[in-house]
Every structure is written in C-alpha cells, then in structure tokens.
Amino acid sequence: MNKKSIRDVEVKGKKVFVRVDFNVPLNENREITDDTRIRAALPTLQYLREQGAKLIVASHLGRPKGQFNEKYSLKPVAKRLAELLGIEVKMAPDVVGPEVEKMAGELRPGEVLLLENVRFYPEEEKNDPEFARKLARLAEIFVSDAFGAAHRAHASTAGIASYLPAVAGFLMEKEINFLSRALNNPERPFVAIIGGAKVSDKIGVIENLLGKVDVLLIGGGMANTFLKAMGYETGKSLVEEDKVNLAGELMNKAKEVGVKLLLPSDVVVAPRIEAGVPSKIVAVDSIPAEEMALDIGEKTAKHFREEILKAKTVVWNGPMGVFEVEPFDRGTVAVAEAVAESGALSVVGGGDSVAAVEKAGVADKITHISTGGGASLEFLEGKKLPGVEVLNDK
C-alpha cells in the first residue's frame, strides 16, 4: 500500500481522531447482536493506546437522518468497547462543540473518548468543510480505519483529512492490501465468483473483472437474467428484463477477452420462497413455468468447485441462492467450502458471502474477509474510494 499507516507517524502524547466503522446491529432493547465490527478495530486502538496516544473515536450508526435520535446513540457501543478493551471508555454527549473539545483536551495518554453518532449532523454526509474543521479541532492526527465507509466522501471519512495529517489504521491497510493484491497482482488462475439477486448491482464489478480474471462463475438470482439471455425459459424466477441484453453483451465480451464465464447448468426450483416448501433440482432447460430458481444445483456446485480448487486467487462477492432460507443455502455453503479448501489467496466480501463462510464454519480458512460491503464492491469495480484517496502518500 502506498499510503501512510499508523506505523509511519509519531503518536505519543498526541490526540488522535480515529474514524472506525461501529455500525453494528442492535436488537429492540438496543443490545448489540454482532460485535464483529468493533472487534475488527481493536488492533488499531490497542496499538495507538500502547504508543501513548489519546484516542478520540468516531463512527456512524444507522441512518438517523441528520438529527439527534436516542435510538441511534453510540452508548451501547461505548459499553461493549469498554468490555473489549478492558478500560473505561468516556462517552461524549455530542460530536463537536466546547464540551467535547474540553473532554478531548483532558484525555491522558492511553485514554479513549467515543464521540456520539457523527450522522446526528446533516453536515457529516454533506462533507461540509466547516463541520470537518470542527472535527479536526479535536485532534492532531487523523486515522482512518473505517473501510466500510471509505466509499463515502463524508466529513469524518474524507473532509477532515484536509486539516490533519491522515493515515490508515491496520484494518484499512489490510483491506487495501488484500483487495489490491487480488485485483492488481493476482497469482493465476484467478477465479471470481459473483452472485446476489441483481445483475444491476454487479454490472460494474463484472465489467472490471472481465479485464482481470481467468474464470468468472455466476450464480444467485442474477444468473437467471443471463440464462434468459441464452434463450432459456426461467419460469417465475427473478429476472431483470431490462438487463437481458446487457447480460448477453457481457457474455460476448467474456468470449472476446478469453475469460471462461460459467453459469449454472442445473438449479433448485420451488413454487415459492419459504422453508420446507417442496423443491427439486432441474436442468436449466427444464425450469417449470410455475416455479422459480432459488439456488444452484448439485452439478453446478460440483462444476464450480472444480474451477475454484484450481485457483490461486479467488474473489467472491454475493450468494449462490436465497441463502437465508433452507434448503436454498446449500449451493452457497458448497462454494464457501470449496474456497476454503482451495488454498488460494481468497478475498470474500458482501454481507451474505461473509455469513455463508461463517455458516459453513470455514471463516478461519479464508485469507481475507472484507468488512466493507459497498466499499469492497466499489473497489472491485475499479473505482477510487474517497476515504482512501485522502490518506497521505508514503
């Protein structure tokens, strides 16, 4: 990575503004149901504390629409962060202003102050320069560790970097390193697995990957649109009619550039999406008119597995079927197992693919699980991420 990281700056005794992604799920009692994102930031926070920095930590949570809303307060996060760090975490009553500046000014080395939800201010998402300056006033160095928000040009992810030295935290560094290694310098064969419901969400990714990969495996609801483009009848399956021509063009482009593009040869069909509904596996040329394709079939899973096992680099984004309803999760789990077994450099992104890897119990065998859904998608599209661009070059 050609951007400076926290290793490249002296932080001892300095106030450091750390933008993290603590956008965690809460239940109706406002208890955190999954603290993965908080844990992901711990190495950066621990390192900065050990180096004697004074930490001012900032994050968004949910979509409070630019106003204070207790429902989106970071108080439950402060409590969990304190448990994980094993220290007291001071909770600021606000994001900016004299009281917060006073609390930041009183911090001692190794202490942590968590600001309230940055999205309580409409200026955050507008990347308002005056608001960014107020955030910058709290500290002397800006550390970005929120890869999950790096595709957003907001005040706390990008704007603040105009006023302070800006460097990457360990999580941000790791994300950039693995994603760019896979995309820009892959060991071959390079296999990409793209799934999810809609082609429209993944057009940019497919177009960018066609110039880089050796094999492209397509599953999930989006595969139906490609099958339709090949002239197959898809019954009641989800198809984006307005994208059928585009799917055809992408298949032609793959041929032109010598990429092996594989679609399902068989699918699991059912009359509707619900657990326990009778389902069966059929070839893609025999999808019943009254049923819908909801997962890749066993032959496809086996075929995809063979391609994945040959790979030296694998990038996977999006499930192979309606993963959240059994038995339509089998194709996705089979792919997860193959990726884990391949021994390839593997990068998995997107909520559902990450959940699949965890469900299959193989998370520890994946080289890198990306914490940023939208950000990793834009990275795969070849876009520049504002939250990365603003960091100081080495």
From Swiss-Prot:
The keyword Transferase applies. It holds the Pfam family PGK. Belongs to the phosphoglycerate kinase family. Keywords: ATP-binding, Cytoplasm, Glycolysis, Kinase, Nucleotide-binding, Transferase. InterPro entries: Phosphoglycerate_kinase, Phosphoglycerate_kinase_CS, Phosphoglycerate_kinase_N, Phosphoglycerate_kinase_sf. It is found in: Cytoplasm. ATP binds at residues 202, 324, 350-353. Its main location: cytoplasm. GO terms for cellular component: cytosol. This is Phosphoglycerate kinase. Its EC number is 2.7.2.3. The keyword Transferase applies. One of its GO terms (biological process) is gluconeogenesis. One of its GO terms (molecular function) is ATP binding. It is an enzyme of class 2 (transferase). PROSITE patterns: PGLYCERATE_KINASE (PS00111).
